[in-house]
Amino acid sequence: MGKLGISIYPEKTTEKEVLDYIDKAGEAGFSRIFSCLLSANESREVILEKFRRINWHAKEKGFEIILDVNPRVFNDLGISYDNLSFFKEMNADGVRLDIGFTGLQESIMTFNKENLKIEINMSNITHYIDTIMDYRPNRDNLIGCHNFYPHIYTGLGLDFFKKCTENFAKYGLRTAAFITSQAENTFGPWPVTQGLPTLEMHRDLPMIVQFKHFVALEMIDDIIISNCYPTDEELEEFKKVRKDMVSFSVSLEENIPEIEKKIVLEEFHYSRGDAPENLIRSSNSRVKYKGHEFKLFNAPEIIRKGDIIIESSEFGHYAGELMIAKKEMRNTGKSNVVGRISEEEIFLIDYIKPWQKFSFVEK
């Protein structure tokens, strides 16, 4: 993945709270800011001064700053698409066009003298991005970002999301999407506060699980927290989670032997290329520990989806191989269930593709 991001809404809170949040997020590994101008209703001078101070602080902490705008904002602030110097004065690194222009204007904007990134709204299936590409933009300054959706049931479906994202990915453009905090009394740019996910299926999931889902999909570069303010505990999880692969949270059997525990938590895992229908197979451990006696110690009659299996020596040359159950199945009596993936993360199994890497962390 690319960057972890946060969102800030200076007109909705105090400047101190915004700056404190930026500091906390920076310490947790975040390096991108989505800052909304759509709901800012002050004068040009007041907006410039307020955002400049905040953005300067953020840049001192190593953040990239993208401002969310639309044609109305351009009009209200007296900005022309061929002169973006106002945003540079605000210490921004780019602008996100919530609503676009004609395609030609966006192309011209990517050649702006200030070298600002021009971010396009990804959450639609039209030929909008194709039109922009027809006008030969500066690809180095063209990126994409999905919307978030405050109203329950209005978030994107997964299939639609994939189609929208693929439309941008085919051009090799950097992409972004939003996850939502589950903290109480959060807010965004609008009065409705029922969470702010890109995907509807994420609305009630723990924020770290939403993140892991995007990592599993392998379609999104930058992942941004949309609402303010996540809890310290939510931010803390991002210090520990792997960003380069899905890291399943697991509970291990109390009597798991040391070698089996080491296989789960320390060995390098990836799904075999000849991926079966019922299991995710990680075979390296059976080679590394060839000759070790894997005794039967927990062979339940039924293996459930989400169970982690390490084959016993009664399975011959399969002994020591790690598997994840993708479906419920009857145990042959030779398979040890050594642990189980957290219930809220079991659905992530369905998104692990052949050769995809994954890991485990004990709860």
Predicted ranges, named:
Residues 48-93, 104-105:
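N-terminal active-site wall of soluble small-molecule enzyme domains
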Residues 31-54:
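Glycine-rich, proline-tolerant flexible connector loops at the mouths of alpha/beta enzymes
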Residues 121-254, 263:
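Catalytic alpha/beta core domains of metabolic enzymes, predominantly
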Residues 2-19, 68-79, 193-205:
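Active-site mouth loops of central-metabolism enzymes
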Residues 253-363:
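C-terminal functional modules
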Residues 17-39, 89-94:
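Catalytic domains of carbohydrate-active enzymes, especially glycoside hydrolases
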Residues 13-26, 76-86, 129-130, 206-213:
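Short, acidic/polar
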Residues 2-10, 33-35, 63-71, 93-97, ...:
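Hydrophobic faces of well-ordered beta-strands that scaffold small-molecule active sites
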